[in-house]
């Protein structure tokens, strides 16, 4: 089996795949223009969507593309072919995204940047830090990643509101709402977290009018696409 890897971390992916199956014939790189001939001989491609899109525009068609990203927006462009199987990376980003968001939330509550500046300037910082318990969090996007984030934040005693296109009861959210409810739900939020993908349906959800409804002290974290 011949496999094409189009990834900036192609060496790592190639090493892992070869260790798992030494019989694989792997062609790997991060410059589509240098791999056109090799790509035409590979029916299976593994790679990041922006590089895969460049290869598709060269007229080379795979049978199956496995994206290394959760998002596949570059592959949805109107000028690209759609006559192949496309799968994306799922089930691996929940922990990473939870840690990413928690880092910013703790830094915000503990006023980390201001305290660091005081420390560098050899100044005593007497500000009282905040905490996460009881904070109102609105998470927009309650798929696999959103649920993983909610489970992490629930351990800190935060009050969680989930927003989805088709809301349904989900643990550990305290309540659920639809996108039509978003304007009302953000009014009491201490944190507004976006986890939505970049699709035509998600354009212009966050606008001046929505942000005007947030409390002055609220923090918006965009971890979506």
Q: Where are the predicted features?
A:
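N-terminal glycine-/charge-rich "phosphate-binding" loop or analogous flexible N-terminal tail
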Residues: 1-44, 157
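NAD(P)-binding Rossmann-fold cofactor-contacting core
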Residues: 155-172
């Amino acid at each position: 089996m011949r496999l094409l890897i189009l990834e900036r971390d192609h060496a790592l992916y190639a090493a892992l795949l070869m260790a798992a199956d030494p019989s694989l014939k792997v062609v790997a790189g991060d410059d589509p223009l240098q791999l056109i001939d090799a790509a035409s001989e590979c029916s299976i491609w593994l790679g990041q969507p922006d590089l895969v899109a460049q290869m598709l525009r060269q007229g080379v068609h795979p049978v199956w593309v496995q994206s290394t990203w959760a998002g596949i927006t570059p592959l949805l462009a109107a000028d690209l072919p759609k006559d192949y199987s496309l799968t994306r990376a799922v089930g691996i980003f929940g922990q990473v995204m939870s840690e990413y968001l928690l880092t910013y939330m703790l830094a915000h509550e503990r006023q980390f940047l201001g305290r660091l500046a005081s420390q560098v300037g050899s100044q005593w910082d007497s500000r009282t830090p905040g905490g996460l318990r009881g904070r109102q969090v609105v998470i927009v996007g309650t798929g696999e990643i959103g649920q993983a984030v909610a489970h992490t934040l629930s351990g800190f005693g935060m009050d969680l509101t989930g927003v989805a296109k088709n809301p349904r009861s989900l643990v550990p959210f305290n309540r659920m709402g639809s996108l039509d409810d978003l304007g009302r739900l953000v009014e009491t939020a201490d944190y507004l977290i976006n986890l939505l993908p970049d699709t035509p349906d998600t354009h212009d959800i966050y606008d001046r009018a929505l942000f005007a409804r947030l409390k002055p002290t609220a923090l918006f974290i965009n971890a979506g696409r």
